[in-house]
Swiss-Prot record:
Residues 30-59 are annotated as: NMP. Coiled coil: none annotated. The gene is adk. Consists of three domains, a large central CORE domain and two small peripheral domains, NMPbind and LID, which undergo movements during catalysis. The LID domain closes over the site of phosphoryl transfer upon ATP binding. Assembling and dissambling the active center during each catalytic cycle provides an effective means to prevent ATP hydrolysis. This is Adenylate kinase. Catalyzes the reversible transfer of the terminal phosphate group between ATP and AMP. Plays an important role in cellular energy homeostasis and in adenine nucleotide metabolism. It comes from Aeromonas hydrophila subsp. hydrophila (strain ATCC 7966 / DSM 30187 / BCRC 13018 / CCUG 14551 / JCM 1027 / KCTC 2358 / NCIMB 9240 / NCTC 8049). AMP binds at residues 31, 36, 57-59, 85-88, 92, 156, 167. Residues 122-159 are annotated as: LID. Belongs to the adenylate kinase family. It catalyses: AMP + ATP = 2 ADP. Pathway: Purine metabolism; AMP biosynthesis via salvage pathway; AMP from ADP: step 1/1. Gene3D superfamilies: P-loop containing nucleotide triphosphate hydrolases. It comes from the Bacteria. Signal peptide: none annotated. The lineage of its organism: Bacteria, Pseudomonadati, Pseudomonadota, Gammaproteobacteria, Aeromonadales.
Length: 214
């Protein structure tokens, strides 16, 4: 079972990825983890990637696709894998297809931008412990204070509304076109494309995924 997850940051992909991995016993493949592992292992692709990164440049799609192919050939991917955060662009998706990497399911987590802004900009964190709250969905007992220590809660830079909106803009420009690409792939019978309402409660989304993936 080879799965690609699509959806904006804050759409709930991470939570559901965990559910799918545990239920189906397949690993989640993150390009960041792959790059770090290849560089540490000193593989040919790892050394190429390191040279590019040391020069302050972006790692090319060719290197990333090569790493993906190496990674999915490993024994823990025998029953499939879960790709989250890759492919991000149509050229990457096309290169993956050309490299013979088949995808069984493309799952798109659909959440309106305003809902994502509300979810992410409402997060509050206790710096000392990492405890996370939400002003609407999981408020602290005392506004702005950690339940355990009574210390101030902070907003992480990543959760600031302006940052969230910038990340959403990048997603819509780069990754949203993939929805059309994989829609055509599904019409051609090359994959199954499923759009999921990410505004539903977490357990309902998990149930829906269990039905879709079997």
């Amino acid at each position: 079972m080879r799965i690609v997850l699509l959806g904006a940051p804050g759409a709930g992909k991470g939570t559901q990825a965990q559910f799918i991995m545990e239920k189906h016993g397949i690993p989640q493949i993150s390009t960041g983890d792959m790059l770090r592992a290849a560089i540490k292992a000193g593989t040919e692709l790892g050394l190429k990637a390191k040279a590019v990164m040391d020069a302050g440049q972006l790692v090319s799609d060719d290197i990333i696709i090569g790493l993906v192919k190496e990674r999915i050939a490993q024994p823990d991917c025998a029953n499939g894998f879960l790709l989250d955060g890759f492919p991000r662009t149509i050229p990457q998706a096309q290169a993956m297809k050309d490299a013979g990497v088949a995808v069984d399911f493309v799952l798109e987590f659909d959440v309106p931008d305003e809902e994502i802004v509300k979810r992410m900009s409402g997060r509050r964190v206790h710096s000392g412990s990492g405890r996370t709250y939400h002003v609407v969905f999981n408020p602290p007992k005392v506004e702005g204070k950690d339940d355990v220590t009574g210390e101030d809660l902070v907003i992480r830079a990543d959760d600031e509304e302006t940052t969230v909106r910038k990340r959403l803009d990048v997603y819509h420009q780069q990754t949203a076109p993939l929805i059309g690409f994989y829609g055509k792939e599904a019409e051609a019978g090359n994959t199954r494309y499923v759009k999921i309402d990410g505004t539903q409660p977490v357990d309902l989304v998990s149930k829906q995924l269990a039905t879709i993936l079997g």
